[in-house]
């Protein structure tokens, strides 16, 4: 009985070697925090026109109700 089991195990290992299985160490590290930060950074990055930089204006979404800048008008 043990010899039959040994033969079966040998055949299975020859047909499907353990090296074919992906190991955790072989996979690139998943970095969801970095992907999220890049997305948030891109979404929060202010988009200035050259004209706005010369005038010293900020983006309209930065203007609050008590803003005294001529750009917030």
Curated annotation (Swiss-Prot):
Contains 3 disulfide bonds. Residues 21-55 form a propeptide. Expressed by the venom duct. Belongs to the conotoxin M superfamily. The modification 4-hydroxyproline is found at residues 59-60, 65, 70. The modification Cysteine amide is found at residue 72. It comes from Conus regius (Crown cone). The cysteine framework is III (CC-C-C-CC). GO terms for molecular function: ion channel inhibitor activity; toxin activity. It is found in: Secreted. This is Conotoxin reg3a. Keywords: Amidation, Disulfide bond, Hydroxylation, Secreted, Signal, Toxin. GO terms for cellular component: extracellular region. Residues 1-20 form the signal peptide.
């Amino acid at each position: 009985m043990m010899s039959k089991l040994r033969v079966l195990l040998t055949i299975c290992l020859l047909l499907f070697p353990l090296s074919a299985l992906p190991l955790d160490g072989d996979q690139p590290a998943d970095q969801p925090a970095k992907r999220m930060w890049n997305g948030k950074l891109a979404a929060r990055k202010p988009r200035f026109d050259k004209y706005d930089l010369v005038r010293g204006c900020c983006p309209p979404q930065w203007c609050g109700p008590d803003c005294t800048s001529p750009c917030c008008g």
